[in-house]
Amino acid sequence: MTKKRKLEGEESNEAEEPSQKLKQTPEEEQQLVIKNQDNQGDVEEVEYEEVEEEQEEEVEDDDDEDDGDENEDQTDGNRIEAAATSGSGNQEDDDDEPIQDLLEPFSKEQVLSLLKEAAEKHVDVANRIREVADEDPVHRKIFVHGLGWDTKTETLIEAFKQYGEIEDCKAVFDKISGKSKGYGFILYKSRSGARNALKQPQKKIGSRMTACQLASKGPVFGGAPIAAAAVSAPAQHSNSEHTQKKIYVSNVGAELDPQKLLMFFSKFGEIEEGPLGLDKYTGRPKGFCLFVYKSSESAKRALEEPHKTFEGHILHCQKAIDGPKPGKQQQHHHNPHAYNNPRYQRNDNNGYGPPGGHGHLMAGNPAGMGGPTAQVINPAIGQALTALLASQGAGLAFNPAIGQALLGSLGTAAGVNPGNGVGMPTGYGTQAMAPGTMPGYGTQPGLQGGYQTPQPGQGGTSRGQHGVGPYGTPYMGH
């Protein structure tokens, strides 16, 4: 029932509304139309505002996107700029590294190649290289050897001044005798003077034929530069950097103090190793020593004057040569070129040996060059002694054994080669002695072919003087 009543009430209300609308006056209808128009205008304004807001939002979104793109572009630009800045910074760091530090690891060949290329492209570099070469005495100092005993400094100046202006000249003399030691030095003011003088290395000065070379090449042996002795050594050894810094010093007596030697050679530059080659038991020199400098320039300075006076000894310096190890015949000689070389032989008679001996750089007498001699006997003395023993032996009651031993020892000390009689006429090495001339020799054949092998109990040619080997070569020591 209740539901039915509600439905009826709703129907009655709906029926009343149209009736009320019909009962509205024209004025009310007009007002209603105006209200509807106002409401419609408000709706249109709201819609227009919404459209404007949407357009503004779209513009703002576009602006935000543009700003984002600009920020991204700016970020990328900053990154590129930062990378470029860091790259240039690293390059500047590389450029700031000192040139000397860059060149130190380079080999000599690399530095020479760079300098040559730079000199070919830049004239100022070539001029600077020439200036440095002119200042360095290595290219201007000449060593001359084979001079006579009476050669003076004035003689050298007169002989070499024709090649260029001389800055300094010195003929080396013995302090005691006052005679020339057979060599000297000439320092020119320019490289051209030294080059002109070396165009003809052999020169006749006085009555002697001399030879000259750059002093930086070191001493000479037998008239040939020391460089010739290195022919058998591999080329890579002589060109190695270590070899360029090492010098060899000969004629170093055992009485010399190694520490004083080190101080003496340190004035040419810092020494890395040395003195090397000392006796492992006594700690003293064995006739030679080696020094290794920190740089090759220091070694060159030490070799500018190859012959140095130290505590009364003449030390002979040269560039060390790393040659092959000595064989059995040279096992007691620490330098492979020293076996037949008088300059390497230790001799207590410093600087007073005969021509060809270690104390002088004179051209040896060809008559005394037949064998490896240590001393050359005066022919007059040998002839007198031989004649005395041959003709007066019986009258003086000489013991034959003593006579033979005397002749044998003289032959050994003089380095006499029985085949050629070094230092005396050839006939004295091979002449025969008639039987009966000397008592006790009648039962022996003549001294055919030289001195006979000594009998038991007799002295012979195998026993020489103290410090002299069986063939006349001075004893080097172990």
Swiss-Prot record:
Protein's cellular compartments: Nucleus
Protein keywords: Nucleus, Repeat, RNA-binding
Induction: By wounding.
GO biological process, one term: leaf senescence
Listed GO MF terms: mRNA 3'-UTR AU-rich region binding; mRNA binding
Main location: nucleus
Residue spans of biased composition, Acidic residues class: 41-75
Pfam families given in the database record: RRM_1
Region feature Disordered, mapped onto this chain: 1-99, 321-359, 442-478
PROSITE patterns noted in UniProt: RRM
Bias kind Gly residues: ranges: 457-470
Keyword Secreted: no
Biased composition (Low complexity): 442-456
Note: Plants over-expressing UB2A1 display severe growth defects consisting of premature cell death and chlorosis.
PANTHER family: EUKARYOTIC TRANSLATION INITIATION FACTOR 3 SUBUNIT G
Protein name as annotated: UBP1-associated protein 2A
Gene designation: UBA2A
